[in-house]
Structures are given as C-alpha cells and as structure tokens.
C-alpha cells in the first residue's frame, strides 16, 4: 500500500502536469486581457507564443543562512511544549521552548525569538519546505544542493545562487561586488573542500564569484590599499599583477574565457578599491547606538554590513552564522543550551535589519 507521502507526490506531479498543459492564458496570467485573447484564439501554436515573465519586485536579495540547520520545532514551528530537563527521553522531545505570539494573529513561534516575532507581519512563514534525502553524514551535501540546485558531486562546478543572480541581473552599483558572502571561513574547517565546492561562480567564470568577507568588522581592510601606499604605486602594482596573471598557469593554459573572466574580476576589484563607495564596508562609521543593536557577534555584525551594502547598491548578500561541523546550529551536543545561545545571536539583528530596511524605504525592494 502506498504511503501518504507517496500519494501526495503522485498527486502533485499529476496536478503540475495538468497545469502545464492548460490553455495559453497561463502564459500571460489568468486576468491578463492579452492572455484571455490568446486563450480564446485557435490560431497559432503554443510554441509560437511569447512567455510573459512577472516584473521584478526586488533590487537586492539578502540570504541569512542558519548554517548547520536550526531545529524547526525549537524555532519557527513550535509543537507541544515539553520543558527541557537533563536525561529527557528523545521520544518525549517536541518543543523545549514555549510558543509565543507574533505580530500576526494565530501565528506562533518559539520563545527566544521575541524580536523576530514583532516583525513577522513583514514577511511570509513557510513551514512546508521539504528537501531530498542526501544522506545524514555531511551537512555540506545539503548546503551544496540548496545553494546551487544541483546534487553533489558534479563533474563541473555548479554556480552558487548568488553567482546566478550576479550573472543574470548584473551589478546594481558598478563599484560594489554583485555577490558578497559574509561570515564563512573556508579554511580551518573540517569540511573546507565541501564548502569551497559551492562557494563559487562555477562555469560562469570568476568575475561572478563571491567576494568573501569572513569577518564583518574587518571588511574595510579588504577594500582599501595597504596603509601608506600612494595611488601611483597602487596603480603600478595593479599593472604588474595583470602581467603576472598572464604568466600564471591560467594565463598559459587556461581558455580565453577563463583568462578574460579573471581579468574582469581584477578590474572589478580595482574599481572597488579606488571608489568612495568602499566606505559602506566600514562598520566603524556606523553610529554607536545603531551598531550596538546589531553587535551580538559576527552574525549580527554581518547583518549590519548587509544593510549598509544594500544601501550602497549590492545585488546579492549572504550572511551566515558560519558552518563548522558540530558547532553553532549543528547542535549534536548540549542542544538546548546551544539553541538558547544561537537565538540570542540571531534574534535582535534579524529583526533590526528588517526594521532598518523598512525605515529607509528599502524593504519593499529587498
């Protein structure tokens, strides 16, 4: 006998197939006059009709990544409350945090996220998202799949979602990298190669790759020339570096596409280093009162940096709590206490980011 899940999968496939075969009015929308006209017309094949895409409603995307995976019943999907106690049998564990009200009637989340609860009316809560079973050994496999849409391993490097957005939409501000990755160290990590596998532009070329800033409070150091270096010397170094790239293995044996992409990425970096917009990376310029609202750790500072970069014209920013095996949200040990600490780190900064974007008129386009 098929299981409930098998039945739902079959029903979903059948429904999608039926929708895909519907009249041409779907191409332009149910209520679109042109779509209705096309639907009523018997002339012309469906293959000749132009797809009408919805208009973009956002300029910037900020992805806040809870690396390691927060437990849904302890955060945004509370179940029956069971107070935590040492030695609690696993079969009795439902939600060890009580449910609290939010700004939306009949929507509750778990205690410890009080600030986020007050801004829930600015967003959409999805509790039905399901991922494929890629094995339980490495979180990196699931992170790779979520960020790229591909199941690892791949014979070619698959682009990160940020690289797709950078490639398709391009930069909003020519001086600000289109894809900025905040908070994740790729070295000194037990799964560094797995992480590197999807923190990449893949087959799009290096110019669309992430501008990595593992430590938000040091971001400004990555976008300004070394102290004391004159503009003339900086320009001379840049020219010399381009010559060295030509003599490198990439320059000697890489394809023309790879070489040109590398040179364009260098040009982008040079443009940023000489731009006044680089001050957006300097958290020391943030007023103390504002900075303190975000200063819960690297993630909170990353949220502040994301807001400043959004104001400066960034296209895609990912801020992560950082994935390290068995640390942070990867709560294999002392799970309840660790979840308490992680909520303290993310609750205020996430809520403040939403409020700040709203106050600046940016929330509707972010």
Positions of predicted regions on the chain:
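Ligand-binding pockets and gating/stacking loops
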Residues: 1-366
């Amino acid at each position: 006998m098929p299981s409930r899940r098998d039945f739902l999968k079959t029903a979903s496939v059948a429904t999608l197939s039926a929708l895909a075969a519907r009249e041409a009015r779907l191409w332009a929308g149910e209520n679109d006059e042109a779509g209705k006209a096309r639907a009523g017309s018997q002339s012309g094949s469906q293959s000749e009709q132009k797809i009408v895409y919805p208009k973009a409603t956002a300029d910037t995307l900020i992805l806040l990544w809870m690396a390691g995976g927060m437990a849904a019943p302890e955060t945004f999907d509370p179940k029956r409350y069971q107070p935590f106690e040492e030695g609690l049998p696993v079969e009795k564990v439902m939600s060890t945090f009580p449910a609290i009200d939010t700004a939306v009637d009949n929507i509750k989340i778990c205690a410890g996220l009080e600030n986020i609860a007050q801004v829930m009316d600015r967003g959409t809560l999805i509790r039905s998202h399901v991922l494929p079973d890629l094995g339980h050994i490495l979180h990196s496999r699931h992170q790779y799949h979520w960020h790229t849409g591909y199941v690892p391993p791949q014979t070619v490097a698959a682009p990160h979602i940020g690289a797709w957005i950078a490639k398709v939409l391009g930069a909003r501000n020519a001086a600000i990298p289109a894809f900025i990755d905040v908070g994740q160290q790729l070295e000194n990590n037990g799964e560094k190669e797995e992480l590197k596998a999807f923190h990449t532009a893949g087959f799009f070329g290096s110019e669309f790759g992430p501008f990595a800033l593992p430590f938000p409070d040091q971001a400004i150091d990555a976008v300004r020339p070394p102290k004391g270096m004159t503009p003339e010397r900086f320009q001379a170094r840049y020219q010399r570096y381009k010559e060295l790239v030509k003599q490198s293995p990439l320059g000697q044996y890489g394809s023309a596409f790879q070489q040109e992409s590398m040179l364009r990425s260098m040009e982008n970096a040079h443009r940023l280093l000489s731009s006044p917009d680089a001050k957006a990376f300097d958290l020391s310029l943030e007023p103390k009162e504002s900075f303190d609202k975000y200063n819960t750790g690297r993630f909170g500072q990353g949220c502040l940096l994301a807001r400043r970069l959004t104001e400066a014209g960034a296209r895609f920013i990912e801020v992560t709590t950082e994935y390290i095996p068995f640390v942070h949200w990867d709560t294999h040990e002392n799970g309840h206490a660790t979840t308490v600490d992680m909520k303290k780190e993310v609750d205020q900064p996430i809520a403040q980011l939403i409020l700040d974007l709203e106050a600046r008129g940016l929330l509707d386009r972010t």
